[in-house]
Amino acid sequence: MNYDETNNELFQESNMQELKYGERNILEGELITFPNPRIGRRYEINISLPEFTCKCPFSGYPDFATIHIKYIPNERVVELKAIKLYINSYRERYISHEESVNQILDDFVAACDPLEVKIKGDFLPRGNVHTTIEVEHYKAS
């Protein structure tokens, strides 16, 4: 390992130590799942996350939304604290409304492979414009 690599690792390590525990949890956050306790039973799970924030990739202004997730689980169910931390990881990202909701769908499907999922991002009005983005995924039969 050369001098620059060593300094970079030490810098990253010291920055991680300076972070508050919640910030570390968000940075390390990933969508964690557990086995569906009722495989074979078709039931719906609804999750509402009212504190979604990201930054506009054009202006840098914050955007605020409620993310609604409605899904029918397959073999895995998403763990609620993990999805909260995952959603919080968007807070400092420069990302459009459209891309954020589509990325959440992609990551959700990759993590728990639901039979069906619908994700809705209901963004607070900005500049007198109210945006709602809805995306869906259906598992191929």
Swiss-Prot record:
Keyword annotations: Cytoplasm, NADP, Oxidoreductase, Queuosine biosynthesis
Binding site for substrate: V78, E79, L80, H97, E98
Protein's cellular compartments: Cytoplasm
Reaction equations catalysed: 7-aminomethyl-7-carbaguanine + 2 NADP(+) = 7-cyano-7-deazaguanine + 2 NADPH + 3 H(+)
Pfam family, one: QueF
GO molecular function, a single term: preQ1 synthase activity
EC number: 1.7.1.13
Involved pathway(s): tRNA modification; tRNA-queuosine biosynthesis
GO CC terms, sorted: cytoplasm
Main location per the UniProt record: cytoplasm
InterPro entries referenced in this protein's UniProt entry, alphabetically: GTP-CH-I_C/QueF, NADPH_dep_7-cyano-7-deazaG_red, QueF, QueF_type1
Family the UniProt entry places it in: Belongs to the GTP cyclohydrolase I family. QueF type 1 subfamily.
Function: Catalyzes the NADPH-dependent reduction of 7-cyano-7-deazaguanine (preQ0) to 7-aminomethyl-7-deazaguanine (preQ1).
UniProt protein name: NADPH-dependent 7-cyano-7-deazaguanine reductase
Organism lineage string: Bacteria, Bacillati, Cyanobacteriota, Cyanophyceae, Oscillatoriophycideae
